[in-house]
Amino acid sequence: EQAIRDAGGIDLQILGIGTDGHIGFNEPGSSLASRTRIKTLTRQTRLDNARFFGDDIDAVPTHCLTQGLGTIMGSRHVVLVATGRSKAQAVHQLVEGPVSALWPATILQHHPHATVLIDDAAARRLQLADYYRETYASKPAWQGI
């Protein structure tokens, strides 16, 4: 945390999202105000990441160092990227669900400069997907995105 402050804060935070809605290894149940810390990874997160370890869950670390949700929220801009059907429920909760520690990514609903980039497969459970597409297609030029 001190190193982040000494560097002037975080300008751009680029995130993925887990199938259970975790971001930055802040698993479900993480405090929405949490700071950078060592975390124990859930079995689901370890299963999701086994592909990077020869599909061997036993080779996946059980702990990690992560920025907390409060730390992430202090970033000036946040971009979250999600692709594929396996992320559809998490994206639905992130965008349309209530803010809850059970779906840590939902805290991003309160970020003033958060952008969510998803493909059609990840968008498949969004109830307002057509509205989101329409508003993006007709956004004012001054928005610059």
Spans of features found by a protein language model:
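Conserved phosphate- and dinucleotide-binding cores of soluble alpha/beta proteins
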Residues: E1-I145
